[in-house]
Amino acid sequence: KREKSFDCTECGKSFKRKSKLKTHFLCHTGEKPFVCVHCGKGFRDNYKLSLHLRIHTGENLSVCPDCGKSYTDKNKLIVHMRIHTGEKFMCSECGKGFSDFYNLKSHLQIH
C-alpha cells in the first residue's frame, strides 16, 4: 500500500502528515501563530515556542561546560561544542571543513 503524501503548492516539498504540511506552509506566508507571552516572539509551531520558553524559565537548559553558554535545545549545544573541540562539518564534495553546519549548507550550494 502506497502512503499518501501532502505536497506544498509553493515549493513541492512532500509530507506524510497534513499537519506537517500546514506548519511548513507558514514559512511561505511568514505567519507565526505561536507567540511568547513573555517577550512577544513568534513561532511557526508550538514545539519551538516550548523550547523558547526555557530561556525565560531557565528550565532544562543545556549548558556548555567550557564557556557556560546555555541552549534550549541540546542539539544546538552539541553543535556549539565544536567550537571548543575543533571538530568540523566536512564537505563531501571538496573536503573543506566548517565549524558551523549552516556555513557548510551554504557552501554546498556552490557545488
From Swiss-Prot:
Signal sequence: where?
none
Cell compartment(s), UniProt: Nucleus
- Gene3D superfamilies from the xrefs? Classic Zinc Finger
One GO cellular component term noted in the UniProt record for this chain: chromatin
Instruction: For this UniProt record, give its keywords in alphabetical order, as a comma-separated list.
Output: DNA-binding, Metal-binding, Nucleus, Repeat, Transcription, Transcription regulation, Zinc, Zinc-finger
Zinc finger annotations (C2H2-type) as residue ranges: 6-28, 34-56, 62-84, 89-111
A GO molecular function held by the record: zinc ion binding
Checking PROSITE patterns in the record gives:
ZINC_FINGER_C2H2_1 (PS00028), ZINC_FINGER_C2H2_2 (PS50157)
Q: What is its main location?
A: nucleus
What family does this belong to? Belongs to the krueppel C2H2-type zinc-finger protein family.
PANTHER family named among the record's database cross-references: TRANSCRIPTIONAL REPRESSOR PROTEIN YY, ZINC FINGER PROTEIN 143
Main function: May be involved in transcriptional regulation.
Protein name per its UniProtKB record: Gastrula zinc finger protein XlCGF32.1
Organism annotation? Xenopus laevis (African clawed frog)
